[in-house]
């Protein structure tokens, strides 16, 4: 259908027209389809068809219209809606009736067929559709047909209805039709009743003819409680009793209709009260008198049933249901009263019943039930009462009717008084009951009070004879008639007759006086708080002098002394009874401590004030009360009520502005602040909170933008709060201040947020500054909780927002910015700040800037000035920089980025505080954060001065960050600070983002670098690198090379830092100038900065970054050095203790060594060579410098000595690399004997010095003490990486043996292992990597020493095992414990993050390196040895531990980082596909080193020990089993499979009589074995999860082999491949050997049915003396232990 609709939309009209002849038949069928989605799609497609064919549909309308109308009444709303949309698309609204009239006969035919003829079986295919679906479709079609008939009747023009009379009469005459009223399906019943309502409206005559069927069908269904049916049913009921005049004659009302109605009413409408009960009034209004018979009985039953319905479960639970019942009850009661407003006896009985038995009991019940009190009952009672009052006082009605209603009113008021008194005149009067009484009286007094609560407009019932309230209002009232202001307001707002209101007022006052007097008795005698609250409610509603007189009289009767109390002088102005009552009673109640909450007493107070006519009198009363010692909550309630009610505010406004209240509030503020800060034993929190709430109220509430109290008192209170916060700042512990500070925050926040212009007060600005200061202090400094600091932040931000936004600008006279800037400046420069303190300070100031920039138009200039005022002077910046620790210098010095020839010993010994941050870091980071914030707001800096200051700030920040970065092992404090600053946006990246708007920053950094060098040069280098500045951008600064001479440290460091970014021409010019100056340098200036040292350092720097300059420069410089060797040999530190030399000489020698290293790099990449003299100088100097470095090891704590040692090792490394990489053709151009001299003397000399030096340093220094040795160890390691295996085996290390250590190695080799292996435990990465590379050179040779030992493992050994090198295994045992302690809390399968270069990192790294060596050793062993080694690993369970640990160290996604993401088709590189390069100095990828190494070890383990891994995997628990399988299959199996297949393809191993081929696509290896006439083909299939899964062996071709033998051989190969730790080729070789032995006549072992044992590869040798059969020793051992017998497995005789 959807495709058809789309086709109709897209195709041409002529094409679509072709469908029309077939469409009616298709539509009529599928519009009734079972699937609602099909029906909806059909209507949507029909719409598209209509839009396309338009008028051409007309010929087909009659065949479509019946089903179309049914579709418009579909029970599935989207389908019905789509059908109606299609209908509207076909016909405009005014044409639709005509279209229906045109097709009415056809429509009626379809509808009548569906209603009278069709059945479930005729509508659907009985063979294809289940019975449930058939019935569902039938019920839906009947429902839709009934609704379609209703729609037809309603839409047809009235003139056309007559033409359907006959068809409708026929329908109504059918019994089947009337059965639909009792149908079990609710939708059919609902549709039936809707049709009945439509027939009553459109064709009443037809229905009258069938009244005998209609009336019982409708009226006797009145108790149907189905929610679907009920609305349609009651509509049909009302239409029926209205349309059919004699309807009651066709039903038995007394036995049928009314009992059912009573039942529905008693059950509260059965959950449908909102539907049923609004229909009750029109229903009973149509019940004739002959049905009612006895009105008293009828109305008693009716209202009793309604009353019971109020108690039903649904009515109690649902306010809406309850409201519907109440409304119906009162409407029907008014109707019944109107119908029986006569003086006959029967009428009087009904009136009596309605008043006494119905209305008054209902009111009485409501006073006990809060649900009824919240219902519309009281308002309905009031409306009923008003209608009676109007009739009683109306001049237009006859006297009899007025007299009757007057009697009704009198009876009502008498009964009401009796009910109210019965509820009040009780000792234990219920609080809910009294609230109900007061609520009812309040509604009767002021009907408008409910309108405020419920503003929803409701329809009102107006009975016949009742006029509109507004039209009946009497406009002329006698002026002499006394009338209260309250009555006038009530009448004017409701439009009611004031005369009637006055009459009710009198009756109400009588009742209120009676109840008040009664309450007073209980208050006085019983001290009843409930009665007191009731009295307060009465007086609040009825603030009348008369009521107070009654109360006063009652008080005087009880205790005449109350009126003449000596405490209060009742002067003539207190003749007012209300005032007398205040002093006689109310004051004592306020002082009564048993009355915890006194808010209701405040209502009485306002009633007293209402009765006072003079404002001065009211002020005097309140002032008098203020001087009394009342609870502060009393004044809180007084002011709260004044703020919520304008009338009450007018009564208390003079008092609020007065001095009496103001002074009391100042005293309150002082007491609260003093007690809260000084006394830990503060009053209860609730009591204090009331006091603080009072302060907050008077400071925050305002009327017409004025404070509630006088401005002077507001400022004094703010002063008190400010003083309190200042004290809180100065107290050492603030834990007990939380409550007071929190309250002050609440008060301040309300004050700042609510009053416009509040910060014009100086005290308010001081308060704001103090809160700002508290917020800027970290919680560990201020000792305040995070929640309180958050509240402080919100408070001061509210104040700042008020300061900015309400003025649209910062006020000119504001001191807040100046004071805050000075305070922040003092904090960052003089205070000791930790990370948290600095973060709090930065965040708080940042909040200040953000708020002002977002709110103020001129915020930028204000904050620029603010930032400038916080900036230190140039001298202060200089002092702060000098205060930074010089530890930073060691790292760039040793890495060769800076050169020094002066004292640098302090770089390692000078320490700095570990608990607070340097002031330079704090100042620079805060100021730069603010500067960057300003740049974000306004990119272009119009004022040059602002730009200069921002550049200085950012430059200092970059300097500080560079200092942090250059620290080799910074304290934790510095690392945390850098992370914090990065999270706040104080970083290089942020500066780079905004560097375009800082054009002067590069020049500033360059100038600082040239002036001071050192760290400024590194800062400039980092900035240029991050910014990506090219040579062209630097050219304006660097083009004049003359300004670098004479060379200073500043110019030297600048060149060294910028050399990588300078253009080649500039570097060439610098090198030429320095070379020329070097050649003419005097002897005295050789070691000076502006001499040999400086020139050589510049040359090294430029040549190191540009090799194109080397060819011409290097020979010349080398000649200069040779001349120095001849003329000034003492400047060369050869074979001496460097510690005794000057710093300048050490620096010079370092630069000479670096130059020679550059020379060697150049020689290795070019065809040039040197002459004998040059090589002699280089080689001899290198060895002499190395000897000096070794002799000076005790002075390595001095940076320049350490640098000298590193440079010497690096030179040795470059020489070793050169000779290793020299090509054969190049060797011929080298001087004669140079290579032999290198191999026989120089290289031997290097490593005879280096290897012992490494061991000595490692033994003398613990890892924690070698922080200054790190670079030396790295350089040593790089040098030792070039040692050959022969030189390593011929080492000169002292002998080292371990007692009891079993070994087959030579003494020299064992000593080497015992010396180097423990260094894998060393807590320095470079040592571990160096030792690994050294041991890896010899690992493959070690298994050869165990080959001889194989003979000692005879057949008598039950489970032979052989340990890998004992030195490695002892180290591994220690490492296992260490790693276990690190990883024990991490479950297998979870990735453990190991922090680089920490202690744990070294433990894990050493553990993995040790295993890598063991696996290398294992791979190099023969098959027989591997079996013994694997047996040892199985016994010690070391391999199991390794595998568990690997699955904690390998990442979940081992993808190599840094790959391009724009190549999705290419397989990503992983840690398994890429080799790990373990470089000694490599720190770029150290973050990934442990995960990558773990993956490498796992890869090696799977490759070399597949059987053992498979065994471990099968023994794992289910979760780990799945984790291992999933990970291995996804990342490792494909790599190993391809490697295994490749190894088979590339194998050079040749088998006699067997050929092996491999297929990589199918992961198969095919082996073909041929001997004599026998031909065997075996297909080896690798599993998807290789090597975890079992390798399958399938049979190919076989010729000349018995089936049983064939099966045995396949089983043997499968066993070898599954259980042997080796490759497929090794397994095939073992299998072939086994088959060969079989053909040679060697018998199979009768236990494993194999000639060669699968583990130790032995032949069957143990023979039974009885049956002579031979067995493998290991097989026999397993047989004996598993069977617990010592008999032969075959003959069962005792085995000897």
UniProtKB/Swiss-Prot annotation:
GO MF term list: ubiquitin protein ligase activity; zinc ion binding
Pathway: Protein modification; protein ubiquitination
Zn finger intervals (RING-type): 1645-1692
Cellular component annotations (GO), alphabetically ordered: cytosol; RQC complex
Chief subcellular location: cytoplasm
SUPFAM superfamilies: ARM repeat, RING/U-box
Function: E3 ubiquitin-protein ligase component of the ribosome quality control complex (RQC), a ribosome-associated complex that mediates ubiquitination and extraction of incompletely synthesized nascent chains for proteasomal degradation. Within the RQC complex, LTN1 is recruited to stalled 60S ribosomal subunits by NEMF and mediates ubiquitination of stalled nascent chains. Ubiquitination leads to VCP/p97 recruitment for extraction and degradation of the incomplete translation product.
Family: Belongs to the LTN1 family.
Oligomer status and interactors: Component of the ribosome quality control complex (RQC), composed of at least the E3 ubiquitin ligase LTN1 and NEMF associated with the 60S ribosomal subunit. The complex probably also contains TCF25 as well as VCP/p97 and its ubiquitin-binding cofactors.
The protein's name in its UniProt record: E3 ubiquitin-protein ligase listerin
Naturally occurring in which organism (per UniProt): Xenopus tropicalis
Gene expressing this chain: ltn1
